[in-house]
Amino acid sequence: MSLFDKKQLVSQADALPGRNTPMPVATLHAVNNHSMTNVPDGMEIALFAMGCFWGVERLFWQLPGVYSTAAGYTGGYTPNPTYREVCSGETGHAEAVRIVYDPSVTRYEQLLQVFWENHDPAQGMQQGNDHGTQYRSAIYPLTPEQDAAARASLARFQDAMQAAGDHRTVTTEIANATPFYYAEDDHQQYLHKNPYGYCGIGGIGICLPPQLA
């Protein structure tokens, strides 16, 4: 596919077929030695896409209350895709991070603040120099409460951009969560394993206004 095509979302009919076998995933998180797959009682899951997942995952594993993070693919059609397939633009997936967190320590609203303030949500099918549908900005809520919070936060951030003189339209996709497929082990906790590796994300200098009571 050409670069132009890679910035157009593929249709389900044209998406790659994928495979039935899930990607092997390490048992333990390379940073904190917590389970990569289990969700302890009382914890919740959040899914965000905001560009290259290497830097995004590091942002979230550093937060208090975050039990584990994982790099992966979601929002598309191809089951159990490879990194190469996702980069082709023919799966429909975004590079995303799965966050398991303790809501008694860090609220979903705080995760949303990290999301909005650490990337450019008005770039469409790219993030910085990374071009393609896999780099789109997206929030994939898993509950009605997450969906409502995500949509309210988008409206507040859009207003904050306008107030700051940035009149672009936020292009962040908010859609119900679809299956999350773990990325290859090389991509998990990449910037822990490769401290000088590429990050590629950065905010636009605008803060998410607090939620009104």
Curated annotation (Swiss-Prot):
Record has Oxidoreductase as a keyword: yes
GO CC terms, sorted: cytoplasm
Q: Give UniProt keywords alphabetically.
A: Oxidoreductase
Q: Which GO terms describe its molecular function?
A: L-methionine-(S)-S-oxide reductase activity; peptide-methionine (S)-S-oxide reductase activity
- Source organism's superkingdom? Bacteria
Which example biological process does GO assign this protein?
A: cellular response to oxidative stress
Enzyme active site: 52
EC annotation from Swiss-Prot or TrEMBL = 1.8.4.11
- Say what the protein does: Has an important function as a repair enzyme for proteins that have been inactivated by oxidation. Catalyzes the reversible oxidation-reduction of methionine sulfoxide in proteins to methionine.
| Protein family according to the UniProt entry | Belongs to the MsrA Met sulfoxide reductase family.
What is the recorded name of this protein? Peptide methionine sulfoxide reductase MsrA
- Top-level taxonomy: Bacteria, Pseudomonadati, Pseudomonadota, Gammaproteobacteria, Enterobacterales
Question: Gene encoding this chain?
Answer: msrA
